[in-house]
Design a protein with these regions (language model features):
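Non-heme Fe(II)-dependent double-stranded beta-helix
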Residues: 1-13, 20-110
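Glycine-rich nucleotide phosphate-binding loop and flanking beta-alpha elements
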Residues: 25, 116, 176-177
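A structural signal for short, well-ordered beta-strand segments
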Residues: 94-96, 123-125, 191-195
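Catalytic core of non-heme Fe(II) oxygenases with the double-stranded beta-helix
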Residues: 103-162, 200-209
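Active-site lining segments that contact anionic ligands and/or coordinate catalytic metals
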Residues: 158, 165, 186-190
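Conserved metal-binding segment of the jelly-roll/cupin
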Residues: 163-177
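Non-heme Fe(II)/2-oxoglutarate
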Residues: 175, 180-240
Length: 240
């Protein structure tokens, strides 16, 4: 059985695959270090009230989006995407983003990133090692296959995704997952490219002109109402 067939089978069965050591060059290592440095510089400028409890902030990687995508976008990668999605890369609008996990207190509750019938692919590029202590993504393998109520989801067996710099995590948006708490006390970054079916004639690569790295607003706003909602969400997420 070829690697490609095995990867496809694993993706269909579990809703995600991990491609180990996919990007390996000195330039990538340099980019990752510089990216993290710039993210932390922005992070340190923030008023950390909103998102401080959730501890997950969305990142727009700016100029790094394109540079890292160039390292990723090999013939092998195109074939893998085509195998999984049954579509060519040019059929997608590709949107770049990322997540900074500085959640030192709570796990998120399990959720999906899309409605069941409206799924898309998410490719996470691992730009720094992810281990047990720094808030790995926790997935519920196989939960992408059918529409599940939340009470059924929480009885499924979970798996934490530990990964090394240069690994890729490809998952479907309707796989149930959550961010876990980062007890390393160092904010941990994970980049993401979202592959949505294109709207125009040709696939749009949104990050072509995206120059400035930004930390975006979190789920909750930096105001009293947002803080109350956030408190409720983190402590009683099973009700939410």
């Amino acid at each position: 059985k070829s690697d490609m067939t095995e990867e496809l089978n694993n993706f269909e069965k579990n809703g995600f695959i991990i491609l180990r050591n996919f990007i390996k060059d000195e330039n990538f290592n340099y980019l990752c270090e510089k990216l993290k440095k710039d993210v932390l510089q922005e992070f340190n400028k923030l008023d950390k009230k909103g998102g401080s409890l959730m501890g997950n902030l969305n990142i727009s990687p700016g100029i790094y989006s394109k540079k890292i995508f160039e390292r990723l976008n090999t013939e092998k990668f195109k074939k893998i995407i085509q195998n999984i999605s049954k579509k060519k890369l040019s059929a997608f609008d590709i949107i770049s983003g990322g997540n900074l996990n500085f959640q030192y207190k709570y796990n998120q509750h399990f959720h999906t990133d899309s409605k069941f019938d409206n799924s898309f692919l998410i490719v996470n590029v691992v730009t720094e090692d992810i281990f047990e202590m720094n808030g790995p993504l926790e997935v519920l393998p196989g939960t992408q296959k059918e529409k599940l109520p939340y009470w059924k989801v929480i009885f499924k067996k979970s798996k934490k995704i530990l990964a090394k710099k240069g690994d890729l995590i490809i998952r479907t948006s309707n796989l149930w997952h959550r961010g876990t708490k980062n007890i390393s006390k160092n904010p941990r970054l994970l980049l993401a490219y979202t592959f949505k079916e294109k709207i125009g004639e040709n696939g749009n690569v949104e990050f072509e002109d995206n120059k400035d790295l930004k930390i975006l607003d979190n789920l909750f706003k930096s105001n009293v109402k947002g803080t109350i909602k956030e408190n409720f969400y983190t402590r009683f997420s099973y009700l939410y």
